[in-house]
């Protein structure tokens, strides 16, 4: 899975882990993060969400290959994720290390 998730000390850490594609985010990854936010919203053990990428790059943004081949699928997943992010009732922090471009900037 390209989104790693773990909760420790009240922090839900969502890590973009797709180094071979410069951490570009596809629909499945957006859906995974949306589902994680949905669960975390009602989980009292989660006090904050930390979004992070790899050591060399945060994210190259949306997966351009998927954008060309399945634009409606990626668009739906992105729309759902950013709506969930805007409505999320707890603090969200992006730990940006290295380049962060495209839709990743909106995080």
Regions found by a protein language model. Give the residues of each.
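Generic structural signal for secondary-structure transition and capping sites
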Residues: 42-45, 72, 90
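Residues that form or flank phosphate/diphosphate-binding pockets in enzymes
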Residues: 24, 59, 103
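Short, glycine/charged-enriched secondary-structure capping and boundary segments
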Residues: 28-29, 63-67, 107
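Histidine-centered beta-alpha loop that forms part of the nucleotide-sugar donor binding/catalytic region
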Residues: 17, 62, 97
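Glycine-rich beta-to-alpha active-site loop
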Residues: 84-107
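Glycine- (often His-adjacent) and acidic-residue-rich active-site loop
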Residues: 53-84, 100
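Conserved CoA-thioester-binding segment of acyl-CoA-metabolizing enzymes
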Residues: 1-54, 83
């Amino acid at each position: 899975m390209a989104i790693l998730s773990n909760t420790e000390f009240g922090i839900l850490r969502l890590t973009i882990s797709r180094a071979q594609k410069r951490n570009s985010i596809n629909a499945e990854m957006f859906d995974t993060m949306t589902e994680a936010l949905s669960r975390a919203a009602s989980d009292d053990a989660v006090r904050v969400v930390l979004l992070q990428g790899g050591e060399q790059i945060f994210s190259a943004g949306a997966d351009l290959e998927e954008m060309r081949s399945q634009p409606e699928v990626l668009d739906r997943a992105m729309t759902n994720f950013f709506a969930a992010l805007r409505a999320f009732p707890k603090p969200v922090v992006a730990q940006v290390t290295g380049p962060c471009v495209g839709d990743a900037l909106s995080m």
